[in-house]
């Protein structure tokens, strides 16, 4: 008696969830960090941009924040949770989940010839968590160049290890009009966080997510080379923003 041959058709390969783009020392303090790009997101503000996460590779991000070792990836940012600041990122959610996935080995190391096509025709967010300037500039530049556009922000313009080439890749975060003017004189395009009702400078544009309801993926002005942007402070810790201005000055 003959029997039907069982199907040997393989199930289609699942798309990769993300990639390890860099693993090495932080530019800011030399501690071990990792950059992971994830290919899908539930972030309704940004839309479906590739998200890059800059994390300590050896410490859970929640713990790193508690003990101040997030300085490797957030530098001297006054808004760090460790500084009792107003950072909007819920570290225990997405950053923690990405770190746990990294520890489980679910993200392959990025190889250009094998994986660049995943980024083709995509827009990329540099630093969904963590500061791009913690990463060697050439690495971040190459990540940005994989896609058709990028956004990015750095709070490290005053850090002793800051690479000035980031002025061409990221908005420089400013907490006051005086800071914004200072960085603009250095050649930066700024992203200023402000309180509701604050006045815009003549050379600033209100974030179009606030004024028009646009997603970042449809705007893309925060690419370091287009406009000076201002946005109303947001997030669950936004009530801490005003007190930080006293420390920042002006």
Tell where the protein language model's regions lie, with residue ranges:
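Class I S-adenosyl-L-methionine
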Residues: 1-250
């Amino acid at each position: 008696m003959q029997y039907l041959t069982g199907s040997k058709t393989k199930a289609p390969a699942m798309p990769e969830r993300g990639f390890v783009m860099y693993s090495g020392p932080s530019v800011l303090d030399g501690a071990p960090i990792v950059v992971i790009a994830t290919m899908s997101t539930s972030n309704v503000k940004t839309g479906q941009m590739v998200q890059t996460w800059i994390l300590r590779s050896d410490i859970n991000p929640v713990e790193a924040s508690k003990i101040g070792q997030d300085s490797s990836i957030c530098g001297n940012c006054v808004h760090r949770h460790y500084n009792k600041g107003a950072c909007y990122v819920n570290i225990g959610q997405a950053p923690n989940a990405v770190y746990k996935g990294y520890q489980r080995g679910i993200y392959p190391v990025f190889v250009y010839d094998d994986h660049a096509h995943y980024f083709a025709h995509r827009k990329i967010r540099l630093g969904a968590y963590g500061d791009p300037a913690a990463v060697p500039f050439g690495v971040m530049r190459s990540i940005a160049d994989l896609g058709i556009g990028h956004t990015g922000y750095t709070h490290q313009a005053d850090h002793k290890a800051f690479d000035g080439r980031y002025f061409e890749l990221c908005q420089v975060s400013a907490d006051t009009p005086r800071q914004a003017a200072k960085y603009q004189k250095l050649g930066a395009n700024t992203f200023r966080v402000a309180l509701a009702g604050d006045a815009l400078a003549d050379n600033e544009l209100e974030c179009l997510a606030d004024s028009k309801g646009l997603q970042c993926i449809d705007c893309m002005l925060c690419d370091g080379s287009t406009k000076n942007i201002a946005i109303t402070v947001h997030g669950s810790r936004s009530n801490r923003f005003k007190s930080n201005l006293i420390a920042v000055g002006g």
